[in-house]
């Protein structure tokens, strides 16, 4: 399904220079709850119904996942990416930070540990935790069975933000 179905996501223009990119203004989780109730696992594409024009907006997928987790009162959010998680040195996988507290994030940004594409991802994590999601895990989706390892073992994968 898409974020347009059931008006799951409603958005307005994020930036006048990027007219097809939106920011989520409202989440209507009922279609997701109905899907769960009928025994299905929803897979949602990150587009939203436009509320300020006729049409749709593209939405950052991490932001869409974060906003949906918040609206569903989820305990955990898992974001898949193409790196092991948050690393002190992005070129050295041995510097993986397995656990990070939200209170540490400003210093990690200041020290340039969090840069580039990791900035919006971490900001989504912080927002989710501050708004009730107990933890967010950033992990490498290329690792075989990474979701199962994270969910069904004590081993854990990636970086846990809490």
Residue ranges and their predicted role:
Residues 1-142, 155:
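Nucleotide/pyrophosphate-binding catalytic subdomain
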Residues 146-162:
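Short, basic/aromatic-enriched C-terminal tail that caps enzymatic domains
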